[in-house]
Amino acid sequence: QKSTLDEAINLLVDKIHSVQPNEIAGHIGDMINMENALSFKKFFEKLKSENLEFREKDFYINPDEKMNYIFNSSIAGIEEADLILLVGTNPRYEASILNARIRKTFVQKKIPIFSIGNPGDLTYEYEIIGDSTEDIKKIVNKEHDFSQKLLSAKKPLIIIGESALELKSGGYVFEEFKKFLTKNNLINENWNGLNILVQNASTVGLLDLKILQNKKEKSSSFFHDLKNRKFKLLYLLGS
């Protein structure tokens, strides 16, 4: 049914007034600019609804500080690394430019590259050292052959993909690697090789805007309530 802009706005207002704040939810798409996202956030604050989300899948993220959700070493910093560990990621398909930089570094410096999980052909050699959270547990507890290699590196670089963060153990994976690197001074004022490889262009900006605030639990109420059809009004912003 065709309508004018005013008619559409009036219909939206009527719908909003007909439901309770906890029955309204919003989802922000991956290509939305930050100005619109901020306005959307303020709009939901006016509605007194906390049901605002941008993730397409329910994966763990800790928004408490920026280093928890960015690529800390930078792409250029890959060339400074003396060891690379991929955790639940295939950079060839998830970030081709980044993968090209890894390949360049491998070809020029012959640095060792390891992976937890089998990402397939990455165009350079790597060694699979595990495929489960149990292997990560052994690494951070210094019970794995790889542990000493990681501790011996001066600038180790770890790339954690969303596939790892989507696991029930996603929070453990990130937090334990962060704790391990910090405790052993592998995160310091000169180097931070703990990197999160996000899939959507807007993710970092939306986290900077505190869209998730302190909701770092993987099983967020948004996805649970959406699955159980508890929302009566779902507002999509470029989603």
Briefly describe each language-model feature range:
Residues Q1-S239:
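Catalytic alpha/large subunits of respiratory electron-transfer oxidoreductases
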